[in-house]
């Protein structure tokens, strides 16, 4: 087929500039890697594979700061997902991915295909997905466009996950004006497997087959990788052709077929990989690179649902529900029979070749002949300029903001109605959290918890991130993101194992934004080392801007923890009247970036103060010990809204109350957001032993009561509020806002 442009026309007209390939990169490819002008198809492949979304060419130097190994890690970054040993020959597999740009443009399909893509990463490793999580960040709900995007994003996540029969058991949803023009949709999936079934995305063995399985290839999602590597503007906000369209029913069949092959016929399979960003070119080139092999593909054999597709379109399509397999020669028909059983296509489209060349044929002609390494290993890493933002320099010279609170009841009630704090059940009730009946704790708890059938073990999982803290103080904010995730895991009675992440930032060519990325990753990395929670997978999503307005830097931490005895799962809500109430951790005047500051001033400002990361980790480990020894009745970590909001949340959906004595604390401290704190309830007969373990880090502040009242005594006031009244405010806030009219 005739190419859309000749190599000479490409050199002259430079269409690659619209595909996120720079002129310097193009010149390097033609002079240093190929020694000739690349043709149209080849230029398109380089544009996709050298995009930030696929290559991490800007962020890779920063990503090297992360630890990625410890005694439990079986597979770290580089494969479809990370794998962690959970004893007894079993492993947990997990990863998070962003689908921010597609979801901003087309919320329903963008969110749905984000779920589908991350599920394929999990089962491509040989694991069965057992849970989904999300991290969603929207503009304010007083905007009709935001309300539409919230509704459709949540519906997309729910529809895809529910059709797959995989519970969505945890997540977070926040609202801030910075996400108005560029929402964040981060999806996480967790899978369970036997360690013997771990797969790799590799293609090796001369003569072995390259097999395409799953849905047909269409024109949806072409250049989705480069779309995700550019800022939004008025022109590309309507670029719906870069958004994929999902079919969860086909994905369910694909999952079962792949696991059938992996578990029952592992000797037929060399490697397997999802066709995600950049479609066939990404999966095939990465597998060939991993196997140090050459590869030859005949694109005429690729199943296509639209006529007249060019080689360029076939290779860069991001049609969903597709996988690429490397199958041992002679077993092609055996593999085909498995996929036939599930009514799925399985076609041999190429072979592994000697050498290291990547060769494509289309319409009987050779349309690509380049080294495999030129697509995967020879990408030019970019040195980015960094500059500390002037706003931070200025804030460091200003006095800290301390709120003046006259009516503590009014402030607490107003905070409970803030969108980020308010009850999200009207959103997550659209997700099936109980399917497969392994869910012990679902949405609304500090972490989602699943039992592992046939064992006494359980898995706890969470997603956490706070862009406000990172915006004000990137390094400390990065630490807080990790500490908040660990706090949610430990509050459930689980030992943190490892993390995945989504690094959501603006344009990295802006020196201030790259400085934010660097500093926050440094903070996260320091916290990962302290907590021994390596980064085993994840992704980077840059260029989250709209017409030059960047989001707050928002690293999302997805963490999984191991519960040794599922009977010792710790609930988030108070359990027994008469139990002692403890505040674990120190409270300071930490209001910069808090929900209280945003509510009272309409903005955020100041510096997020550093804290003793090692000390926080030490007492969190001691707290976990008390849980494992059966000393704790309930636990809830403190986050948005501080102690006041957390106290209310522990008695919501119960018929109990709290009597709290904070006579040594001024009123504002009730809403401080000092990290690493917990509300813990303990039976009176276990209180002495609990205090002996926690020492000065546990502060007795009250007791659980039979009355449905929240009573708090403060140095300069009192709070006496009916819990049912507070709960009504908390529950009705988001439904009322979603129904409002502009």
Curated annotation (Swiss-Prot):
Keywords: ATP-binding, Cytoplasm, Ligase, Magnesium, Metal-binding, Nucleotide-binding, Purine biosynthesis. One of its GO terms (molecular function) is ATP binding. SUPFAM superfamilies: PurM C-terminal domain-like (SSF56042), PurM N-terminal domain-like (SSF55326). ATP binds at residues 56, 95, 501, 538. NCBIfam families: FGAM_synth_II, PRK01213.1. Part of the phosphoribosylformylglycinamidine synthase complex involved in the purines biosynthetic pathway. Catalyzes the ATP-dependent conversion of formylglycinamide ribonucleotide (FGAR) and glutamine to yield formylglycinamidine ribonucleotide (FGAM) and glutamate. The FGAM synthase complex is composed of three subunits. PurQ produces an ammonia molecule by converting glutamine to glutamate. PurL transfers the ammonia molecule to FGAR to form FGAM in an ATP-dependent manner. This is Phosphoribosylformylglycinamidine synthase subunit PurL. It comes from Limosilactobacillus reuteri (strain DSM 20016) (Lactobacillus reuteri).
């Amino acid at each position: 087929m005739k190419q859309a442009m000749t190599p000479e026309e490409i050199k002259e007209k430079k269409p690659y500039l619209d595909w996120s390939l720079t002129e310097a990169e193009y010149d390097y490819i033609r002079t240093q890697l190929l020694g000739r002008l690349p043709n149209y198809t080849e230029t398109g492949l380089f544009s996709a594979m050298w995009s930030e979304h696929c290559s991490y060419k800007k962020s890779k130097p920063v990503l090297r700061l992360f630890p990625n190994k410890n005694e439990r890690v079986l597979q770290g970054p580089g494969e479809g997902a990370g794998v962690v040993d959970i004893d007894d020959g079993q492993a947990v597999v997990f990863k998070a991915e962003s689908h921010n740009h597609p979801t901003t443009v087309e919320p329903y399909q963008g969110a749905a295909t984000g779920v589908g893509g991350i599920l394929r990463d999990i089962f491509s490793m040989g694991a069965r997905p057992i849970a989904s999580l999300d991290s969603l960040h929207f503009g304010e709900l007083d905007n009709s466009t935001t309300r539409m995007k919230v509704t459709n994003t949540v519906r997309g996540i729910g529809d895809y996950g529910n059709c797959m029969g995989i519970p969505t058991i945890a997540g977070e949803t926040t609202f801030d004006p910075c996400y108005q023009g560029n929402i964040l949709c981060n999806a996480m999936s967790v899978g369970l497997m036997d360690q013997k079934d771990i797969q790799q995305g590799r293609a090796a063995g001369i003569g072995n087959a390259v097999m395409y399985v799953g849905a047909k290839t269409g024109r949806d999602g072409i250049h989705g990788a480069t779309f995700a590597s550019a800022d939004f503007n008025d022109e590309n906000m309507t670029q719906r052709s870069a958004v994929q369209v999902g079919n969860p029913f086909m994905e369910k069949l694909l999952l079962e077929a792949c696991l059938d092959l992996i578990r029952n016929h592992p000797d037929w399979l060399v490697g397997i990989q999802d066709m995600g960003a950049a479609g066939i070119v990404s999966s095939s080139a990465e597998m060939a690179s991993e196997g140090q092999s050459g590869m030859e593909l005949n694109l005429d054999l690729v199943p296509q649902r639209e006529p007249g597709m060019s080689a360029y379109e076939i290779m860069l399509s991001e049609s969903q529900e597709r996988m690429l397999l490397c199958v041992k020669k002679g077993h092609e028909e055996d593999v085909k029979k498995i996929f036939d059983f599930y009514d799925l296509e399985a076609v041999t489209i190429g072979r592994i070749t000697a050498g290291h060349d990547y060769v494509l044929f289309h319409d009987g002609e050779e349309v690509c002949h380049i080294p495999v390494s030129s697509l995967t290993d020879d990408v030019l890493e970019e040195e980015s300029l960094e500059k500390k933002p002037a706003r931070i320099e200025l804030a460091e010279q200003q006095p800290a903001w301390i709120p003046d609170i006259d009516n503590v009841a009014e402030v607490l009630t107003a905070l409970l109605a803030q969108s980020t704090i308010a009850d999200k059940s009207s959103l997550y009730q659209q997700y099936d959290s109980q399917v497969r009946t392994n869910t012990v704790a679902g949405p609304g708890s500090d972490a989602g918890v699943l039992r592992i059938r046939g064992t006494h073990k359980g898995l706890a999982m969470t997603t956490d991130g706070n862009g406000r803290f990172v915006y004000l103080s990137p390094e400390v904010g990065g630490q807080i993101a990790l500490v908040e995730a660990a706090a949610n895991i430990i509050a459930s009675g689980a030992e943190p194992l490892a993390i995945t992440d989504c690094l959501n930032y603006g344009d990295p060519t802006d020196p201030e934004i790259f400085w934010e990325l660097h500093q926050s990753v440094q903070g996260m990395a320091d916290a990962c080392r302290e907590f021994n929670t390596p980064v085993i997978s994840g992704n980077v999503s840059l260029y989250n801007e709209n017409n030059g307005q960047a989001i707050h830097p928002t690293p999302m931490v997805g963490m999984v923890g191991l519960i040794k005895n599922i009977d010792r799962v710790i609930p988030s809500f108070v359990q027994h009247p008469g139990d002692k109430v403890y505040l674990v951790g120190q409270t300071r005047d930490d209001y910069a970036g808090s929900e209280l500051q945003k509510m009272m001033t309409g903005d955020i400002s100041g510096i997020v103060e550093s804290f003793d990361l090692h000390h926080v980790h030490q007492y969190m480990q001691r707290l976990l010990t008390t849980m494992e020894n059966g000393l704790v009745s309930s636990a809830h970590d403190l986050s948005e809204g501080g102690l006041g909001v957390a106290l209310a949340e522990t008695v919501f959906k119960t018929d109990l109350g709290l009597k709290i004595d904070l006579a040594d604390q001024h009123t504002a401290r009730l809403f401080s957001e000092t990290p690493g704190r917990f509300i813990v309830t303990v039976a009176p007969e276990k209180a002495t032993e609990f205090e002996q373990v926690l020492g000065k880090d546990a502060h007795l502040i009250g007791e659980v009561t039979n009355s449905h009242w929240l009573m708090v005594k403060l140095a300069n006031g009192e709070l006496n509020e009916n819990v049912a009244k507070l709960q009504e405010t908390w529950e009705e806030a988001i439904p009322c806002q979603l129904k409002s009219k502009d």
